[in-house]
Amino acid sequence: DLSAAGNLPAGKLREFRMAACEGIDIGKYIKAGYDEEQLKQIRTALEKALDIDPYINPAQRGASIREIALGIGKNLDVKTYADEQMNWQQMRERRNGLEHRIDISVYNNRMYSWQQMREIRLGLEEHLPVEEYKSFMYTAKEMNKHRLKLMQEANKANDKNEETGKQYDDFTLLTDGKQMEAFIQVSAAGMKIPK
């Protein structure tokens, strides 16, 4: 019933009408004071049958509500990042961390900018020792430099391991740098050597 929408601004009226066409009632959100962008994200979430009510409030921007809906849609623990004191980019970094199954408690602090959170998250995804650069004293740009340096060091170590050998339970397979020759080094601990 659009008559209940009476004096709504055009944007809110459009969202009300679009929701009504889908059989969704967003009247309580309009009465609560949500703006047009928030109503759009709420309507979109409700169209997907996502239960966003426990996690949203009118103080959040539409983009924050979208991040919450994305997390619910992916069965993530939304309450770990649906923090009204964080901006939507910080919420996105926390959601991305949960999607990649990393421990977001390492950067779960609103004192980090979203760019700093991203650098820590990327380091965790790459299994780097982020403790070396996660200090608040580093800017996101400095964190990026530290992360890239750690990645280079890790790649060099991996390349060296590939050149020198691969460890198995009872022997080590050694190859030269060009992998043109291979040698097997047998471990006496794992083998029965006849006397």
Predicted feature locations:
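General marker for long, soluble alpha-helical cores
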Residues: D1-K195
